[in-house]
Amino acid sequence: RIFKKKKKYKTLLNVAVPAGMWQKAEEIICDDKDREYLRKIRREYKNLVRNIWNPFDSSHEGILGCTTVNRLYITPIGDVLVCPYVHIKIGNIFKQTLKEIVDFGFKIKHFRNHSDLCLAGEDKEFIRKFMTKQGQSIFKPADASEIFKKKDFIEK
């Protein structure tokens, strides 16, 4: 077995993401069967963590949900991505303040609204609509202001 039940270390699980050379590999996307298996081993091996799971839940069943915008990724050239696995930039720290960038990111419904699914590795509709642009990568992220339409933003 890869995992030991009585070890004191944590193992971070990341699901496969259709990005880079795997951008069109839809078959790798985590499905209901995969999620059920992950829930099963989470309960069995209490040292497993995922970014979407609640780490303080002693029953090992709680879901925090996707943490886009809450955990940003800043590239060496200053592009601010909503997640290292979602290759969409919401701004650039050399052009805007981080507060302006975060405020803009939370105006996008997909990032503001709760999702139990990892947008990058589980939400097939989000992946098809926003993560499959030609040449899109961590080095050439899609620009949120260009790919999202008016209906994708919250109204104030």
Show where each model-derived region lies.
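Radical SAM enzyme [4Fe-4S]-AdoMet core and its adjacent flexible, acidic
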Residues: 1-68, 74-81, 85, 91, ...
